[in-house]
Structures are given as structure tokens and as C-alpha cells.
Amino acid sequence: DADRCIAVDENGKVIDGDLILYICGKYLMEQGRLEGNTIVTTVMSNLGLYKACDKIGMKYEQTAVGDKYVYENMLKNGYILGGEQSGHIIFSKHARTGDGILTSLLIMEVILEKKQSLATLAGEVKIYPQPVIRVMVEAATDEICEKYVNSVVKVIEDQGLTE
């Protein structure tokens, strides 16, 4: 549905959403167009993105995984750029969700304006190994969740917060 953008540089290296956020964020920040000099990412973003941002003074906020959470944070705090490693990139001045075509156009703008290759632009970020571990959970999770939810509801009721 064209809501994501993953690029490939001239050397065949995949440029994922983290790299795109860095490239576009840095470009917008240099132009004074990045609100709060901040991008919004998710907890799945690579450590290399954060280290590269720190190096240039670009701030970041993390959300839960999901472009919905990224957009909520952007809207709440007035940020204009956010996204996910998966390529969901949101430019809130233009759309409320990821737009792959818009993202690809901004990447091309950065390449043309800075007169640098995509490999050079992305090369400022050192990507670190990032294992993803899936944990299998027994079917009893519904019972556990119900107990947890019930205990939270009880605390809320006990504190008189239901009115």
C-alpha cells in the first residue's frame, strides 16, 4: 500500500527506516526545519541511529513499536519527523501516516541538495548488531492477563480514581 520506503544505495546496501530518519532528520535540522531538533523512533531502532544523532545534536524520543504510537508522540509534542526501522516514515506536515512516495522524494531532495551519494549520507551511521528474540508463551497467558488486569482495576477503584 506504499506506506513504507526502504532504499538501496549505489553499492546495493539496504537503507532502512533508521537510516532514512537520520538522513532526513539531519537535513531538516540543518535547515532549521526540524521542530525541537527531534525525531521520533521506536524501541526497535538501532543503537547506531542514537549514537549518530547524539554526535550531531539531534534529539530523539522513543515510542512503542507501531507507526500509530510514533504519530501520537509527534502530534502531542509538535514534532514533524518520525518513523520505524521498517520504513514507515511520517512527515506530519504532509501526512498522518507513512508515505513511501513522499519519503522517497525527500531522500532524492537531500541527495540533490547536498550533492552527496546515498551511501555517503547513510555512512554517518554505524549500524550495530541487533538480535530480535521471540519468546514463546504458554496458552495460560489469558489467565495471567486477566489476573493482572483485575489487580490493576482493583487498585484504581481502591484509590477512588473511577469517578
Per-region residue spans from a language model:
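Short Gly/Thr/Asp-enriched flexible loops that form oxyanion-binding sites at enzyme active sites
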Residues: 3-21
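Phosphate-binding and adjacent anionic-ligand microenvironments
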Residues: 10-11, 31-163
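Motif I (Walker A/P-loop) of helicase-class P-loop NTPases
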Residues: 21-24, 104
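A conserved helix-loop-strand patch within extracytoplasmic ligand-binding domains
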Residues: 23-33
